[in-house]
């Protein structure tokens, strides 16, 4: 892939999602955009970039940016971070709140496993300092397909097996 083409697509990923794609991972760009390029009839990634630059189509640009981002996720992917949120962050935020209500936003939440992991952890290991609190968890993502998967919370055997114990 030409360096200029890589730079344009990497910039689109960064602006559209906040995810940086290093030059060493340029093969990911081609792999992630292959289906879109075929569907749209582009022979090369340069043709796709030319289309993005010559025709202002925010819907298509968002689709390309969404295809570029990593969707690697699983339940309890970073259990230590989730524990810190439950044991430290949420109790401090609740103490600072006068409402007894907390809102947690999982930005870049992909298909929802992290948000559901947080909910499971809160259910299983609710600290005394959070009892009685109303906690809302919202997961968002730039990929509409991922957001819909999170909304319906229907996961296959592989997704469930990857991160959840047999006790859950």
Language-model features, listed with the residues they occupy:
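Conserved class I S-adenosyl-L-methionine
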Residues: 98-118, 136-138
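Short, internal active-site loops enriched in acidic
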Residues: 34-35, 110-112, 142-145
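Conserved strand-to-helix beginnings and helix N-cap segments that scaffold or border functional pockets
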Residues: 26, 79, 115-119, 151
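Conserved AdoMet
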Residues: 1-105
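Extended basic-aromatic, gly/pro-enriched interface segments that bind polyanionic ligands
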Residues: 107, 128-168
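Short, well-ordered amphipathic alpha-helices
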Residues: 84-93, 115-126
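A short linear boundary/processing microfeature
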Residues: 54, 91, 124, 128, ...
């Amino acid at each position: 892939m030409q360096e200029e083409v890589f730079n344009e697509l990497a910039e689109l990923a960064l602006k559209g999602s906040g995810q940086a794609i290093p030059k060493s991972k340029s093969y990911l760009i081609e792999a992630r955009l292959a289906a879109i390029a075929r569907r749209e009839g582009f022979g090369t990634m340069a043709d796709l970039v030319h289309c993005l630059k010559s025709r202002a189509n925010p819907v298509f640009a968002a689709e390309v940016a969404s295809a570029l981002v990593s969707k690697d996720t699983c339940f309890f992917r970073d259990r230590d971070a989730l524990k810190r949120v439950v044991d430290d962050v949420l109790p401090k935020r609740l103490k600072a709140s006068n409402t007894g209500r907390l809102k947690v936003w999982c930005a870049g939440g992909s298909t929802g496993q992290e948000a559901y992991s947080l909910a499971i952890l809160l259910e299983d290991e609710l600290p005394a300092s959070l009892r009685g609190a109303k906690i809302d968890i919202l997961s968002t993502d730039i990929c509409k397909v991922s957001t819909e998967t999170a909304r319906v919370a229907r996961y296959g055997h592989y997704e469930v097996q990857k991160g959840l114990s047999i006790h859950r």
